[in-house]
Amino acid sequence: MAVLSEIFATKHRGALARSEALDAGGDVPEDVPHLELSDVTTLELEVLGEVAARTLRFGTGDLELEEVDLDHESLFELPPFLCEVLVELGRAEDPEALADVAAEWARSEEMTSTPAVTQPVVADLVELVTKASRDGLSVYLWVEPT
């Protein structure tokens, strides 16, 4: 069974409210930049960060997503280093960098996917994180409670 998840950009209070709406299965406003995904959890995003940082020779930093709040166990914030790496991936001089990262991410032990599936996900994620960075928003991952 696929694990449903959503990555979105907002302020802290908005993230808590969106997480509650997602947890309840209710209507969620469409005015927040977001990506609906399946089978992308905290671990897969950490691996994506490792792959992107290595490909870009960006260095090392904190890639571990942390729970935002004890009352919101399904909500995680992407750490600043991971966001910086993804923004840099969107600005990479090598036009193949994004495709290379997506392909290596697809081949990683943690993913069960193909580059054809991961490349649009990585491109959309880079776009969302870049917009969030420009707008001064944080990026969050919500994972469907199991």
Predicted regions and their residues:
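Acidic (Asp/Glu-rich) sequence patches and key acidic residues
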Residues: 1-127, 131-135, 145-146
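Short terminal or interdomain "cap/linker" segment that borders an active site or interface and mediates
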Residues: 138
